[in-house]
Amino acid sequence: MEHTYQYAWVIPLLPLPVIMSMGFGLFLIPTATKNLRRIWAFPSILLLSIAMVFSLHLSIQQINGSSIYQYLWSWTINNDFSLEFGYLVDPLTSIMLILITTVGILVLIYSDDYMSHDEGYLRFFVYISFFNTSMLGLVTSSNLIQIYFFWELVGMCSYLLIGFWFTRPIAASACQKAFVTNRVGDFGLLLGILGFFWITGSLEFRDLFKIANNWIPNNGINSLLTTLCAFLLFLGAVAKSAQFPLHVWLPDAMEGPTPISALIHAATMVAAGIFLLARLLPLFISLPWIMSFISLIGTITLFLGATLALAQRDIKRSLAYSTMSQLGYMMLALGIGSYQAALFHLITHAYSKALLFLGSGSVIHSMEPLVGYSPDKSQNMVLMGGLRKYVPITRTTFLCGTLSLCGIPPLACFWSKDEILSNSWLYSPFFGIIASFTAGLTAFYMFRIYLLTFDGYLRVHFQNYSSTKEGSLYSISLWGKSISKGVNRDFVLSTMKSGVSFFSQNIPKIPANTRNKIGSFSTPFGAKNTFVYPHETGNTMLFPLLILLLFTLFIGSIGIHFDNGVKDNRILELTILSKWLTPSINLFQENSNSSINSYEFLTNAISSVSLAIFGLFIAYIFYGSAYSFFQNLNFQNSLVKKNPKKSFLDEVKKKIYSWSYNRGYIDFFYTRVFILGIRKLAELTHFFDKGVIDGITNGVGLAGFCIGEEIKYVGGGRISSYLFFFLCYVSLFLFFIP
C-alpha cells in the first residue's frame, strides 16, 4: 500500500507532457501542429485516464485501509526557516482526484467534437489540460503555501478559459470581472495564510489542527486573532465558490465555451472553495463564530441563487445560478458541521451538473444552425421549445439531470440534499425552513428550464415577429406580459427585449399567419416550407452524456445506509462514503457510525420529495405544454379584457421578475458604488495630484523664477542703484528695531 502511495505525486504531473508538447509545437512548428490538431486530443485523454486509474486505485486502498499518507521534501532556507513541499493522500484527496479526473476526461472527449471547428482548438486543449493539472495539484497539496500556489494557477486558467473568445468584448469583460472578483478573495486567503504562519511558525495542516485541538480550547492563543485569520481564509473560499457577496462573476463566466462551463461548475474552480473549507474544517470547527458565519453565508447564497434563477432566459446562466445555490447547500452543511453530507452533495452535484451543462451544450450546438452563432440567440430559451422531437437522447439525459437536481429519488442528488435538509433542521429551524423552501424553488426553476427548452413548439421564428402588426411573440416577457411601448429599453440592467410567458394564461393572441408558420416548421414531414431543423449531436458528444447519466443514476448509492450490526438495542447503519471518510471524520471527532431511524428517514424523505413535486407541478402549470394554452387564447384574452386592472398578484410577479432578471440589482449596486466610486476617486486623486501637488511644486519653481528675474533687473550694474536699495534696507531694519 505504502509503495503505491509513494508515487501519488505523479498524478498532477501526468497531463503536463502533452501540454508542453502542444505548446512547443505551436511555437516551433505551428503549421504542422495545427494541421494535426485533432490528434492531440488522444494523448490528452489518455494521460488523464492514467491519472484516473491511479486515483481509483488509491481510493480503493483508502476504503479498505482507512489510512492517511503524507510525504514531504524539506527545503531549508536557513537554520531558522525551512519550507516543506509534498503531497497528502487521505479520503478527501482521493474523492477529489476521482471527481476531477472522471469529469475532466468526459469533458475532453466532449470538447473534441464541440470545439472541432474552432480556430483555437489546440489552445483550448492546452488551457483545459493545465486547468486539470492545477486542480489535481491543489487537492494533493500538503500545506497552505502549496494550496495557494495551485489556487492561483486555477484562477489563471479560469481567466484564460472564460475569456477564450477574447475578441468578443463581452467575453473579455467577463474574464476580467472573474479575475478581479477572485483577487478580493485571494488577497484575503493570502493574509489568512500569513496570519497563521505568524501564529504557529508553520504552514502545515498538522500544526493548524494542533491549534484547534490544544491551544484554542485552553486559551493558549488569542482567539480574536485566530478568528480573524480564519475569516480571511474563508474569504478565499467565498470568492472561488461564488458565495454571496462575491458571486457576481459566476453568471458572466458563461461567456466561455460550454465544456469549460461544465468543468468549472462540476469539478474544478467552484469546487476549490468547498475543498478548502473541508480540508480546514478541523480548524474552523473549534471557532463557533466562524462556523455560524459560514452557515449563514451558505444559507443566504442558496436562497439568493434560487431566486435569481427564476427569470433567466439564457440556459447557461440559469444553470450557473443553480450551481451557486447548490454550493450554498454545501457551505451550509460545512457550517453546521455536516462534513459527510457536504462532500456527498459535492459528488452528486458534480456529475448531475456536468450532465446538465454538457446537455445544454448539445442543445446550443443543435440550435446554432437555425438562429446563428451568437450566444444571445443560441443560448436563449425563448427561441427553443419542442426539442424533445429532434434531440431525444439529449432530452432524456437532461431530464434525468434536472430531476436529480430537483431531489427526486432514486437519482443522485436526492440522497445528498435530503441529508443536508435533515441536518439543517436539527441544527436550526431557521436554516431548515430556508433550505426546504429553496428545495421547492430548485424544482421549480430547473423544471422551468427543461420545459422551455424541450416542451411545446419550436419558437425559433419568434425572433422575426417583431415586425408583425397583428402581434409579437418575441416581445413577450418571460412572465407573460407584453412589453409596452413605454418601457425604457436602455435601463442599465434591463436587457429584456424578448421572452416566453412565465404564466402561460396571459400569452397574447397569436395571429393566424403566425400559427401556420409554427405548424409548418414543427412538422418534419410534409412541410410546405423548407427549414433547417435541430438535430442530435454526434456520438462523440453523446457518449459523455450517457456516462454521466449512469453516474447520476447510481452514484447516490455510496450514501445509502446499510446494516452494520446492533449496539445498545439500536441498529447501526453505515454507508460506503462514511467508511471512506472515517480517517478524516476522526480528525474532528464526528461519529461515522451513526444510528439511523428508518421512520425518521422516510419522514424526511417524504417531506423533501413533496416539496420537489410541488415545485415541479407549479412549473408545469406555468410552462408545461405551452401549445395547449395557445388553443384557448380566445378564452384567456376575453378574461383579460373583462379584468383590465392589474391585481396585487400581478404586481408581486412583476417585482419578483424584476428582482430575478436584474440579478437582484447587486451588479447594479456594485457598479454604482464600487466601480463608479473608484473611478470618481481616481479622478479626484488625479485632480489633487495635478492641481495641488504639482501646483505647489510648480508654483515654488515659478515663484523662484520670478524673484530671480526681479533681482536681475534690480541690480542693473549701477552703483547708484546699489546705494539706493542699501539705504532702503537699512531704513527698514532701523524702523522695525524697537
Swiss-Prot record:
Question: Which InterPro entries does this one have?
Answer: NADH_UbQ_OxRdtase_chlpt_su5_C, NADHpl_OxRdtase_5_subgr, ND/Mrp_TM, NU5C-like, Proton_antipo_N
Question: Got a GO cellular component term for this one?
Answer: chloroplast thylakoid membrane
Which domain of life, per UniProt?
A: Eukaryota
Q: What would be an example GO MF term here?
A: NADH dehydrogenase (ubiquinone) activity
Q: Could you give the subunit structure recorded for this chain? A: NDH is composed of at least 16 different subunits, 5 of which are encoded in the nucleus.
Q: What does this protein do?
A: NDH shuttles electrons from NAD(P)H:plastoquinone, via FMN and iron-sulfur (Fe-S) centers, to quinones in the photosynthetic chain and possibly in a chloroplast respiratory chain. The immediate electron acceptor for the enzyme in this species is believed to be plastoquinone. Couples the redox reaction to proton translocation, and thus conserves the redox energy in a proton gradient.
Q: What is this protein called?
A: NAD(P)H-quinone oxidoreductase subunit 5, chloroplastic
Look up and give the organism this protein is from.
Zea mays (Maize)
